[in-house]
Design a protein with these regions (language model features):
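Short, compositionally biased leader-like segments
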Residues: 1-15, 318, 324
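Short, conserved catalytic-motif segment at the N-terminal edge
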Residues: 6-69, 91
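Alpha-helical scaffold elements that line and support the substrate/ligand-binding pocket
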Residues: 42-43, 68-89, 116, 161-191, ...
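Short, well-ordered beta-strand elements
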Residues: 44-48, 352-353, 359-368
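Flexible glycine/proline-enriched surface loops and loop-helix/loop-strand junctions
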Residues: 62, 148-155, 166-170, 258-267
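Active-site helix/loop module of the DD-peptidase/beta-lactamase fold
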Residues: 63, 68-72, 86-128, 146-147, ...
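Active-site Gly/Thr loop motif
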Residues: 217-275, 304-357, 393-397, 402
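Short, gly/Ser/Thr-rich active-site loops of penicillin-recognizing serine hydrolases
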Residues: 266, 287-290, 303-311, 372-418
């Protein structure tokens, strides 16, 4: 007999379908523990959590349960650079070496911040493996990064910088911040604290382990079986030992359930927090970023549709669209109501994004890893339910994933306990 998963939280009136799909994720789609949150027009309209925080046992996923979100961290890291740009500390079109002279080694002198954040720099590999011990020494990590040679001529193509992007963003922040804070500290001080977020890039040691969800990772057998969900080109890259995709993971191998790994800063992949926190952060962006000191000029830069001359991703083997550190909508990754949407997915199924035209901030997190490159059925069911609810509040402007919509007008929404 299957035990029904506990579900708790709140939804606004009109958003009950999100709760229904959340329940179906446990009953039909295999979720173990998860949470979903959405803010619309600056107000919380969905905040649900449920299931178990560990794959085995009966410890419940509670309101304050946090989980590592893998590459969904990249979007939060990119927000820190947007704040730096708004403050005049960072020019996206300047060479990285202007701020970090040592970066210019081995053919990298002309690489701009934009090229790096757009995954065009060719810095997808690490010639030296970074252990947890080395990751604690950021100066040592910086020397490794500075010595790296690009895998292709920078600016001529693009490819997903799986684990390295966050490490390079770390060094940019450390060099442009007048206080030389780490990216994790900068995020905490300038984004998390002002917004009241429980999200960390570098987990504090005083966070009790009982608050952390444990990931159910893929075994080798399940991993091979799960490849049927990925595009054939990506599958080929994953099973080819010498591919850039396979090699991109070799420089930084860590167990996402290892507390030591969570306590160092890996801004491309080890952020820990709640869906509520990420949805709130993206809501601030969806509202224009004023809460974070984002200027209209920076907001326009960050939300401008990406210019991708060659959509094929050299690492993934399929088209991808990135701009200034964020994933953007494309033919094979459709989210948001217009090309201005921005966010970041994470390995296993987590996803968070901002939709400025709909004024929506959204996030989904879970502890059971699946292997969809995009549109994990669990997450997409929730996302679609959110947009259906928004459309019902404004029937004459129904949402279409592939069609831009105008900003939605204010609607009175009362929050009801469920």
């Amino acid at each position: 007999m299957t035990t029904r998963a506990h579900i708790d939280g709140v939804v606004a009136s009109g958003f009950n379908d999100v709760r229904t799909e959340f329940e179906r994720n446990f009953a039909e789609r295999g979720d173990i523990g998860a949470a979903v949150a959405a803010y619309w027009r600056g107000e919380k309209v969905v905040d649900l959590w449920g299931g178990r925080r560990t794959p085995e046992g009966d410890q419940p996923w509670n309101k304050d349960t946090m989980v590592v979100v893998n590459s969904t961290t990249k979007g939060l890291a990119a927000m820190t650079l947007a704040v730096a740009n708004a403050r005049g500390w960072l020019d996206y079109d300047a060479p990285v070496a202007r701020y970090w002279p040592e970066f210019a080694q081995n053919g990298k002198a002309a690489i701009t911040v934009r090229q790096l954040l757009d995954h065009e720099a060719g810095l997808v590999l690490l010639d030296e493996k970074l252990t947890i011990e080395k990751l604690r020494d950021l100066d040592a990590v910086a020397r490794v990064l500075a010595r790296q040679t690009p895998a292709w001529t920078p600016g001529t193509r693009h490819g997903y910088h799986t684990m390295t992007l966050g490490l390079y963003m770390q060094e940019i922040v450390r060099h442009v911040d007048p206080a030389h804070r780490t990216l994790g500290r900068f995020f905490h001080d300038e984004i998390a604290t002002p917004l009241g977020l429980e999200f960390y890039i570098g987990l504090p040691r005083d966070i009790p382990g009982e608050r952390l969800a444990t990931l159910k990772t893929l075994s080798a057998a399940r991993g091979l079986l799960a490849l049927r969900y990925t595009p054939p080109a990506v599958t080929l890259k994953m099973i080819t030992p010498g591919s850039l995709l396979r090699r991109s993971f070799a420089g930084l191998a860590a167990d996402p359930n290892d507390r030591r790994y969570l306590e160092v800063e890996v801004p491309a992949g080890n952020g820990v927090g709640t869906a509520r926190a990420m949805a709130r952060a993206y809501s601030a962006f969806a509202e224009g970023g004023a809460e974070l000191g984002i200027t209209p000029e920076t907001f326009a830069r960050v939300t401008a549709p990406p210019e991708v001359a060659r959509p094929r991703d050299e690492v993934l083997g399929v088209p991808s669209y990135f701009s200034l550190g964020f994933l953007r909508p494309g033919p094979n990754v459709s989210f948001g109501s217009s090309p201005r949407a921005l966010g970041a997915p994470g390995a296993g199924g987590s996803f968070a994004f901002a939709d400025p035209d709909a004024r929506l901030g959204y996030a989904y997190v879970m502890n059971k890893l699946d292997f969809y490159l995009e549109d994990d059925p669990r997450e997409k069911a929730l996302r679609d339910a959110v947009y259906r609810a928004i459309a019902r509040h404004r029937p004459e402007r129904r949402h279409s994933i592939s069609q831009s919509t105008a900003p939605l007008r204010s609607a009175g929404i009362s929050v009801a306990r469920t």
